[in-house]
């Protein structure tokens, strides 16, 4: 049987890094940051701890790498959802749905963004603010275009929608609401969001705005 060190020498660096991130994701989502140890991650990856430190200088570096991946993925899926249609009501449904799809993913990566146990760390705070701000910018651009509201007001509305999506998705994924089917939860929250945002007068814009549901 190959030793941990022998197995570690057989994998290209990029592939090894991806493997370590997968192992760390499993350990962090199971134990949380504070209870997880680099030994746990090395064991989960089937390597020695010195090999792990060749790729990541500390447990925090490893955690931040995973947080960056999760934040980037959430921004990406929301942006794709917003860009998937020109119909405003459908945009709301798609954007809200993106948050629910994110929290229902088997990878558990949403916990890095929504349930981090390192929110007191400045480097984590900056990343969490960035992901909310980036998503709000995407949504605010659509609101400003369609309603002619000033940029500051559009951004405030967008941040509010992000908060609605995030908190409701976190609640839905908890055991308290596990009985609500995913599609039903998405539609409920999208309808609430649309009934609010559709109350603002539209500019002379070609987009239709049928009420979802």
Could you tell me what each predicted segment is?
Residues 19, 23, 27-61, 65:
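Helix-turn-helix
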Residues 94, 101-140, 148, 156, ...:
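Short secondary-structure transition hinges
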Residues 17-18, 38, 60, 64, ...:
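Short, structured helix-loop boundary elements
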Residues 72-75, 122-147, 155-160, 167, ...:
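Amphipathic alpha-helical packing segments from all-alpha helical-bundle domains
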Residues 1-15, 201-213:
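N-terminal intrinsically disordered/low-complexity leader segments
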Residues 65, 79-108, 149, 157-161, ...:
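Hydrophobic alpha-helical connector segments
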Residues 16, 59, 66, 70, ...:
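Hydrophobic/aromatic residues within well-ordered alpha-helical segments
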Residues 102-105, 109, 141, 158-179, ...:
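Amphipathic C-terminal alpha-helical segment
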């Amino acid at each position: 049987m190959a030793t941990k060190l022998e197995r570690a020498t057989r994998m290209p660096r990029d592939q090894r890094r991806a493997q370590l991130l997968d192992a760390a994701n499993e350990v962090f989502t199971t134990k949380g940051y504070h209870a997880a140890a680099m030994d746990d991650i090395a064991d989960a990856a089937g390597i020695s701890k010195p090999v792990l430190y060749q790729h990541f200088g500390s447990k925090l570096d490893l955690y931040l790498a995973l947080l960056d991946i999760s934040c980037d993925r959430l921004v990406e899926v929301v942006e794709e959802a917003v860009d998937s249609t020109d119909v405003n009501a459908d945009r709301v449904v798609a954007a809200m749905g993106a948050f629910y799809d994110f929290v229902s993913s088997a990878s558990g990566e949403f916990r890095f963004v929504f349930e981090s146990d390192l929110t007191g760390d400045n480097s984590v705070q900056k990343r969490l603010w960035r992901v909310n701000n980036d998503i709000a910018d995407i949504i605010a651009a659509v609101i400003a275009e369609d309603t002619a509201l000033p940029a500051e007001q559009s951004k405030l509305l967008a941040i509010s929608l992000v908060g609605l999506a995030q908190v409701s998705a976190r609640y839905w994924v908890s055991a308290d609401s596990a009985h609500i089917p995913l599609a039903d939860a998405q539609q409920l929250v999208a309808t609430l969001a649309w009934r609010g945002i559709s109350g603002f007068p539209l500019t002379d814009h070609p987009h239709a705005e049928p009420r979802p549901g």
